[in-house]
Amino acid sequence: MNLEQYTKINNFFIRHSTAFSLLLTANRLLTACGFLLYPLLLLCLLTKKNIAMLISFIAIPALCFLAGTIFRKVVNKKRPYEKLPIQSLIKKDKKGQSFPSRHVFSIFLIATLWFCFWKPVGIFLFIAGVFLAIVRVIGGVHFVTDVCAGALLGVLAGLIS
């Protein structure tokens, strides 16, 4: 997105406080949704005594998350509020490390794992992931390329698991 688009979006949310509150709430709830469902998946695998899948669903995502974190530090891509003269709607003091989006990576990874285990929950999380990606871009903390890369890498990491 460019400066004009971000300005229009920011102005809309500044004028409509209810929409602004919904945006911030959506960011928190969608993020929490993925992170709460991941331990539940691991618990399900444990109760089904599927230890091989449990180990795989812990070890590979952890390694991918670590590799992604290191990659973000090396690339150190600026965030929209650093590159453009805008105020992000989602408050974030962090500089750089925008690419790929770790929030979107995580929810798409968890969605893929759930999809392999129980498709309805996976589908729900994929939909939540799309909304989270939109919220992160509208909120001014990521560019579209950041969230698209996060989604793609999350799915790939999930498939490897």
What are these regions (language model features)?
Residues T18-A19, K49-M53, P80-Y81, W118-I123, ...:
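Membrane-helix interface segments
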Residues P39-A67:
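Interfacial segments of alpha-helical transmembrane regions
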